[in-house]
């Protein structure tokens, strides 16, 4: 049923007829949902599980279930972000942007965007984030918008600096701009690598100490630019999970977990992998462990990690991941956000897989967290009915 009701790729952009959190109509910019589902079905071994493994395990008295959940994530909302990119006389590149960073990998992924435009190594790009002394315009890091909005602002500024570099290098080397390339911190002539000039030297020469600056130009190799998306980009994906539930303790063990994600063009696969895995871990906490308890006076009873349960290394499974890339038409980099992709579908996925594990019982799970005592209580009416 889900496969039959997917929005076809040729129907995008697709108006969802509701208002999104940025107070604009929710319009899905792009997507290709069926390949993601196909990959998830293959990675989880869906057909083999339901045809062979699940019947065998159930015959042995095991309560095993499988779940598959698809989702769409709204990302990359406005209003805007900005950035400044500067090539210093040392040849290093400094970048400043208003967004903050809390471990998303900005220092690597944003540096990659600049390095690709200017032909320098990532190690030679110095990034400053969230410092109003360096760059004071910006909205912030939230709602899976950092890479989409700030990343494209950085890209726009880097493109402007690239244009300045090529223009200045063409003047210094007396060649046409189209005959130049930026490689290894050099502006050099294509096919004649010995005819080159360092970017640091160009930066020094772009700041004349004598004479007038040429009309239509400005000193230095620096640019500031901003990016404000027309609307948010929509990422998507599929999570699949196989679980086993102990009927005595009601503990849920995750036997296999699969994520297939589409966030458009991927900047850094390793960082994306970490984002997804961290989100899944948080989602597992939401689905099975984390809950605040209060007494009749409103006093919080589990205010420390001694008694507030969170997932640990031995309860978070190995997560198999794969990707589908459907570029967003809303920004030059073609990217979509990934900050919440790991967490969004985990609760419904838990509910679906656990319901399947008790298929002989009329079990309907409508809320999380699904702690053992809550699962026990939910099962009692159904168990009594089949007793």
Regions found by a protein language model. Give the residues of each.
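Cofactor-binding beta-sheet edge motifs in enzyme active sites
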Residues: 2-35, 42, 47-387
């Amino acid at each position: 049923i889900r496969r039959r009701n997917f929005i076809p790729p040729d129907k995008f952009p697709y108006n969802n007829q509701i208002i999104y959190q940025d107070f604009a109509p929710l319009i899905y910019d792009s997507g290709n949902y069926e390949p993601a589902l196909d990959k998830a079905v293959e990675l989880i071994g869906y057909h083999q599980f339901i045809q062979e493994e699940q019947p065998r395990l159930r015959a042995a008295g095991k309560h095993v279930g499988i779940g598959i959940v698809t989702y769409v994530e709204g990302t990359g909302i406005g209003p805007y972000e900005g950035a400044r990119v500067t090539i210093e006389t040392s040849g290093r590149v400094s970048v400043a942007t208003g967004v903050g960073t809390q471990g998303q990998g900005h220092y690597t992924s944003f540096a990659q965007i600049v390095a690709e435009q200017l032909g320098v190594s990532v190690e030679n790009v110095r990034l400053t984030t969230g410092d109003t002394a360096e760059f004071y315009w910006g909205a912030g890091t939230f709602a899976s918008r950092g890479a989409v909005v700030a990343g494209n602002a950085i890209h726009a500024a880097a493109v402007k600096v690239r244009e300045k570099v090529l223009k200045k290098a063409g003047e210094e080397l007396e060649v046409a701009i189209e005959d130049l390339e930026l490689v290894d911190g050099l502006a050099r002539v294509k096919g004649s690598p010995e005819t080159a000039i360092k970017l640091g030297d160009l930066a020094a020469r772009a700041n004349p100490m004598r004479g007038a600056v040429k009309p239509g130009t400005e000193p230095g190799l620096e640019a500031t630019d901003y990016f404000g998306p027309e609307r948010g980009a929509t990422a998507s994906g599929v999570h699949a999970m196989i679980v086993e539930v102990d009927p005595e303790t009601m503990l849920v063990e995750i036997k296999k977990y699969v994520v297939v994600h589409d966030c458009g063009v991927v900047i850094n696969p390793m960082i994306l992998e970490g984002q997804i895995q961290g989100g899944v871990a948080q989602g597992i906490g939401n689905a099975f462990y984390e809950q605040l308890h209060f007494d009749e006076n409103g006093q919080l009873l589990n205010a420390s990690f001694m008694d507030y349960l969170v997932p640990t290394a031995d309860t978070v499974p190995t997560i198999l991941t794969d990707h589908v890339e459907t570029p967003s038409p809303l920004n030059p980099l073609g990217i979509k956000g990934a900050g919440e992709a790991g967490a969004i579908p985990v609760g419904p996925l838990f509910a679906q897989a656990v319901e399947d594990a008790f298929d002989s019982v009329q079990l309907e799970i409508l809320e999380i967290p699904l702690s053992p005592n809550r699962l026990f209580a939910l099962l009692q009416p159904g168990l009594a009915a089949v007793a």
